[in-house]
A protein has these predicted regions:
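Membrane-embedded alpha-helical bundles that constitute the cytochrome b-like, heme-associated redox core
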Residues: 1-130
Length: 130
């Protein structure tokens, strides 16, 4: 007898991150979900910071002090990395949805990871002025 779907639960959420039984497509799915969650968190944080900037010149000056810190720059690099990975993985999903490269999902995924690493390195080197 087949098990009935009982609705969402925390246990079902954590199944996303269980490495057992995942093939390349499963890892691509997990990467897409994690980057989407990270970008959503960043958007919320960004809106809070914009609200602080609305407090006038003192809020803006304190923001600039924070924005020039290496930790903040590293956080920006993480956002850029998530955006690049999410965007390229989205292109892979669109291609496979339309039947392009369905039999070559592994190559597409590792290709997008390679392109992502190169682009993220270029952004990182420019952001940290290296």
């Amino acid at each position: 007898m087949e098990k009935q779907y009982n609705g969402p639960s925390p246990a079902k959420f954590w199944i996303w991150f269980n490495p057992a039984g995942h093939k390349t497509g499963g890892w691509a799915f997990i990467l897409n979900r994690v980057t989407a969650l990270g970008l959503t968190f960043y958007l919320s944080l960004h809106l809070v910071i914009l609200g602080l900037l609305a407090k006038g010149p003192s809020g803006y000056d304190s923001f600039l002090k924070l924005a020039r810190s290496p930790l903040f720059t590293f956080g920006e690099l993480l956002v850029v990395a998530a955006g690049i990975l999410h965007g390229l993985n989205g292109i892979r999903i669109i291609l496979t949805t339309f039947g392009v490269g369905v039999t070559r999902q592994k190559q597409l995924f590792f290709g997008l990871l390679g392109i992502s690493v190169i682009v993220i390195l270029v952004f990182g080197l420019r952001m940290f002025n290296i």
